[in-house]
Amino acid sequence: MRRPKKYESGEATQYISRRAALRKLQLSLNDFRRLCILKGVYPREPKHRRRAQKGSSEIRVLYHTKDIRFLLHEQIVWTLRDYKIFAKKSNRDRAIKDFRNLKRRLALFPEIKLDHIVKERYPTFIDALKDLDDCLTLLFLFSTFPSLHLIPREQSNLCRRLTVEFLHYVIASKSLRKVFISIKGYYFQAEIKGQKVTWIVPHYYPFKPQSRQEVDFKVMSIFVEFYTIMLGFTNFRLFHGLNLAYPPQFPTNMLQDNEDTFKDESSFVSDRIAALNFELLRTDKVQEDEEELDIDMELLEQDGDSKRIIKMKQEAQEVARLRTLFKGLKFFINREVPREPLVIIIRSFGGKVSWDSSIFPGSTFDESDETITHQIVDRPSLATQYISRDYIQPQWLFDCVNQRQLLPTNKYFIGEKLPPHLSPFVDSKRDTYIPPEEKALHDPSLIETHEQSDDDSDEEAAQEEEEAVDQELLDAQLQLAYQQETAEYKKYGGPDGVNEDEEDPEEDEEDEDEEEEEELDEQAKRLKEEKQKMSVQSGKVHKVNKRQLHKAEVDEHRLQARMVKPRHRNLFRKLIREKQTKEKEEWLLRKKRRTFEAGEKEARKTAKRAARKEAAAAAAKASKLGK
């Protein structure tokens, strides 16, 4: 029997280094990276690196051997090899100045087709929706970039077109559920086919070029190349699910014959599509989302009234109310407010919106329209204001959507200090520190009240003492009335006031003597029992020794650590460190909260003192004038 050699089986054959993979595929490093990104192949971390590297302790980039075999049968490998041949021949034509042949070669430039890779990586439509988060975030980012060396203008325009099409679907389907503003940008979450899709739209700042060391645009552009194909397929499927024409089109009654349409109809239509303020053309006019919702509710009602069904009914009713949150409201967006994120929010929940026509095409009404209910402003003051509308800050829209109701606008007026903007993406049932504002968001009954002053607390204490004294007097009166009633009962011999012992005086006297003896015995027993009950005993104060409690907890923790198996100790230590980190963060947050509340309390006291001083000064001044 042949003795097996070392590193010919097991973990050593499961992994392959990147250099060996390049030799096997006959590709350059850049082409290999591109192929791995498109196919979804990533480096792997072995459990025992020394065994996987056949005894070498040098840290190398490793891949699964099966993944590299999988890449050997890919059609793109031949296209990437054709690039090398094309580059050599085109350089030769340039060198000999054969421009006729060079032009012919450029027309036959080899193109990579990624359709089969999208179908391969996402067998079902739901799989594509699950991986849509990173796709949308990256495409929204690239849609804001100008033309760069590694980012051609056509790629940025394609990203912009695909993202606008997706936003039109979100508006038409009313599938937006959560929104949030942060330093990174605007967070949006939509529910599509039962899947929650979250993406970030960056803030509209001027572009600042980055150095090569910070951002690798070449690798990012490869991801964008794949994600554009994927989102194109997804948009096509989503639009046809709502019976919308794809690519997006407008009804014929919207394309009026004016100077803009005569000049360039395609640019006119593209500008209106980018405005996100118009309904798109439908292939089937009969499209009622409310009917589908009613059908679903009927199906739920047939299933019974279990807790799960009741919860599903409540969620469906909340979503139905949320879809029409801004129905019947008209908004006007000022110049300083970012237009696109607010248009998405307002139109996704049934509202109407417009802006100044000089900012962007697609406005439907002017600022002077008297039917406007809300005007969104982000400046400290405004010169001209209308009485018929509310002037609010943009945060009001986001908070209304997250709380799923129209909030009062008095906290969001111009120049008002805004309430804290809480994230809806945080789990409300977590074990970490939850600020009181977030508790009030989920349960309005938990809103914290202001601390009472010393005068109010003294008045309440005096009132409680008076109530206690009244209760004692009432108990004494009831006890006296009971004693009088029992004495009358004994005196007259019964409840009817009839003395039955008058018929036989001798027997009555004997019975009375026996009853008196029994009553005396019972009274003696009662007195003994009452004395035992009313006896005062010296109590012992149970002092809690905090040091002993802490020591007991430490001993218990050490015992748990000893009970852990040796192979699980690293995991146990990691969990303990995470727990300690969370506790420390929670302690720091509570400390910050206490400092903040103490500062606010001191500020209120200072303001009260200043107001009292001003009032006293005004009174003194008035008294002097009166004299």
UniProtKB/Swiss-Prot annotation:
Q: Which domain of life is it from?
A: Eukaryota
Subcellular compartments: Nucleus, Nucleolus; Nucleus, Nucleoplasm
Bias (Low complexity) occurs at 616-627
Pfam families in alphabetical order: BRCT_2, Pescadillo_N
Q: Which InterPro entries match?
A: BRCT_dom, BRCT_dom_sf, PES
An annotated Gene Ontology molecular function: RNA binding
Per UniProt, residues of the BRCT domain are: 321-414
An example Gene Ontology cellular component term from the record?
A: preribosome, large subunit precursor
Q: Which UniProt keywords apply?
A: Nucleus, Phosphoprotein, Ribosome biogenesis, rRNA processing
Q: SUPFAM superfamilies from the xrefs?
A: BRCT domain
Where is it mainly found? nucleus
Q: Where is the composition biased (Acidic residues)?
A: 453-471, 498-521
Record-listed Phosphoserine modification sites: S453, S457
Q: Does the keyword Coiled coil apply?
A: no
Biological process annotations from GO: maturation of 5.8S rRNA from tricistronic rRNA transcript (SSU-rRNA, 5.8S rRNA, LSU-rRNA); maturation of LSU-rRNA from tricistronic rRNA transcript (SSU-rRNA, 5.8S rRNA, LSU-rRNA)
Write out the biased-composition intervals (Basic residues): 540-549
Biased region (Basic and acidic residues) positions are 522-533, 550-559, 596-605
- Region annotation Disordered: where it falls in the sequence: 436-471, 489-562, 596-627
- What is its biological role? Required for maturation of ribosomal RNAs and formation of the large ribosomal subunit.
UniProt cross-references to HAMAP family, sorted A to Z: Pescadillo
Per the similarity annotation, which family is this?
Belongs to the pescadillo family.
Name listed for the protein in its UniProt record = Pescadillo homolog
